[in-house]
Amino acid sequence: MINKINKSILIFSVFAFGFFISNLLRSITATLTPALSTEFNLSAANLGLLAGGYFLGFSLMQIPTGMLLDRFGPKKVIGYLLIIALIGTISFAFAKSFAGLLISRIFIGVGVAACLMGPLTGYRVWFEEKYQQRANSWMLMVANFGFVASTLPVQILLPIIGWRSIFLIIASLILISIILISILIPSWETKRDEDQNNNLQNLSHIWKNKFFISLVPLAFFNYGGVQAIQTLWAGPWMLNVTGYDAIQSATGLFWINVTMLFSFLIWGYFLPKLSSKGIDSMRIVKFTLPVSYIILFLIVIMGDKAGATMFTPVSYTHLTLPTRFSV
């Protein structure tokens, strides 16, 4: 257990930097849609597959990553995986075809797969219990700084240096993150083989848990849906349906992600207070998700009149779902 506040802040900052990069890479395709579509003549299906490549690599690695984290710890697992992300990011910057872009995105997804769960694993061991929930909430806030950075800042740089140079800059940030992790993150006590067998048994128990099973469709369709909107489809919608130009679209994405940033702040502040009054997060989910459904329905009905102002409350109400999983 790490008791020194300065050391804890340093560890958090190093992990947060890596997670910031992870989410910058996750959502940057929404801002780059016009540039990539023009250069590679991409269809809507191509764009969807390109954005999904990140999540494909990311999701396939989650269970193996969890086992690796338990055995080898965040320092080694995040560090080595980020090398894969570094390769994927450089490869994306030099890609000459859609296939090259897609393969690179899959590599990026694989490489950043431990950027959240790795820190949470470390916090559980290194931080006092009273600080763990706060650190977890702040990590989710950091994610939205990455989302925000992928909007207007990227759009401003785009005509100046081009999207390929932007990815090379991100690659340099990944390299810095790898170095910081290797130097500043504590080592991990390697677990024995019997502990790995217990991990497999625990995984089996999770998949048999009725409450977990009941939340799987909710996470798949609802949280997955808002991620699809946030990281890709909100941008093309504003460009092709509402008639926004590239700057207006990036501005819309900026405010969507700023809303999400403050939403984590608000939910992080009020959830413990509501919980102390007997109002658990599941009750809040049951209230807020229907609100988001109504807003999504209005977006469909309004068509070209539904701009960023309609997508921002969807971002806010959907953020109750990940808070449920963190309990």
Describe these PLM feature segments:
Residues I11, F17-P34, L42, Q230-G235:
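Extracytoplasmic
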Residues T29-A30, F211-F254:
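Extracytoplasmic gate region of multi-pass secondary transporters
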Residues N41, G73, F94-A99, M302-G303:
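Helix-breaking motifs and short loop linkers at transmembrane-helix boundaries and internal kinks
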Residues M61-F94:
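Conserved MFS/SLC helix-loop-helix module at the cytosolic interface between two early adjacent transmembrane helices
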Residues S104-V142:
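Cytoplasmic helix-loop-helix junction between adjacent transmembrane helices
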Residues M139-I183:
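Helix-loop-helix hairpin linking two adjacent transmembrane segments in secondary transporters
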